[in-house]
Regions:
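Extracytoplasmic copper-binding redox domains, predominantly the cupredoxin/blue-copper superfamily
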Residues: 248-328
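Predominantly soluble domains enriched in secretory-pathway, periplasmic, or organellar proteins
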Residues: 1-260, 265-267, 302, 327
Length: 328
């Protein structure tokens, strides 16, 4: 209700360790099944940091020195010095409170206001001390230097960028090289495919002083948050191993497939394998409660199977080695 009525809104700095301690001691009130701790009754738990109107991104620099706050309705991004923030907390350097939560003095905790452009939202980092902030209103990404605070470059985005991600760009050791703008609108960047359209995400080369747009590709509407990580960090399984499938209705031999009845309840144990289901058919009575358990017995990567049942809005997809059930 009060959003955008004042010069600044707030970022909440939460001492999660203190919250953890309070929760362990049984502090808090159960509301709708969730334990809620009132920060106004627990001094030192939450502090308010004034920030530009409608704060969106709150991002920490790789060295942990700066907290970068971006208010969507202000043309600057604010760099808060974390040491100064902690000093202000210790010294009770407040300008008042909001609902019992102390407000840190803005001038005591900020190092700079960086004039990045209109509609700043989120910030990512490179390994060389540069930061990259998305500009929703300007439809651009601003590149600026931590510590000296000058904006050194901008690259247009098409269009209305929201989030962005650079290679491990919100970690303690960003890789640099590549950045992706996750745009909210595409507006003709692709052939028209109807009322529901993909949005344009754009790959940017950040290896040089000047950023360079190198590729458009298309994602689901309203992309939010993404990560770029080294490929060798991803070590997924490619099939669910047979010996690890502990589903009570899993079967691996066609002789175990079939339907069993218990009163008006029917259990169908089914096998899926290239390219058939066993059993291929079964009969039930009107009013029966039917449970189908399908095991994809493939142990070859990428050999998934699907089962759809007309008129019941049922669609199952089983990955290799997986069992799924549905009751209707």
């Amino acid at each position: 209700i009060t959003s955008a009525q004042r010069d600044r809104d707030y970022i909440a700095a939460v001492d999660w360790r203190k919250a953890e301690e309070l929760a362990a001691k049984g502090e808090g009130t159960m509301i709708g099944g969730v334990k809620v701790i009132d920060p106004a009754k627990n001094p030192g738990l939450v502090y308010f940091m004034p920030c530009g109107k409608s704060p969106h991104g709150v991002d920490v620099s790789p060295d942990g020195k700066y907290v970068i706050g971006s208010g969507k309705l202000q043309g600057v991004t604010t760099a808060f010095n974390w040491e100064k923030v902690q000093t202000a907390m210790r010294n009770k350097d407040f300008t008042g409170d909001e609902d019992g939560i102390p407000i840190l003095k803005y001038e005591s905790i900020k190092d700079a206001e960086v004039p990045v452009g209109l509609g700043p939202l989120h910030t990512q980092f490179g390994p060389d001390g540069y930061a990259y902030t998305s500009l929703f209103v300007d439809s651009a990404i601003a590149k600026w230097k931590l510590g000296t605070w000058e904006v050194v470059d901008k690259v247009p985005m098409s269009y209305s960028i929201g989030h962005l991600t650079s290679a491990e760009g919100d970690t303690v050791s960003p890789d640099g090289k590549w950045l992706v703008g996750l745009n909210k609108l595409s507006h003709g960047r692709h052939l028209s495919v109807g009322p529901s359209q993909p949005e344009s995400s754009q790959l940017v080369d950040i290896t040089e002083e000047k950023m360079k747009l190198v590729l458009d590709f298309f994602t689901e509407p309203e992309p939010h948050y993404a990560q770029i990580i080294k490929a060798d960090k991803v070590k997924p399984i490619e099939v669910y191993p047979k010996e690890e499938n502990k589903h009570p209705h899993a079967i691996w031999d066609v002789k175990d497939a079939g339907a069993t009845r218990n009163g008006n309840k029917v259990l169908v144990k089914m096998i899926a394998v290239r390219s058939t289901f066993t059993p291929t058919d079964f009969e039930v009575k009107d009013g029966d409660e039917v449970t189908i358990a399908v095991t994809n017995i493939e142990q070859t990567t990428d050999e998934l199977h699907g089962l759809g049942i007309l008129d019941y809005n049922i669609n199952l997809v089983m990955d290799p080695g997986e069992t799924k059930t549905v009751t209707f």
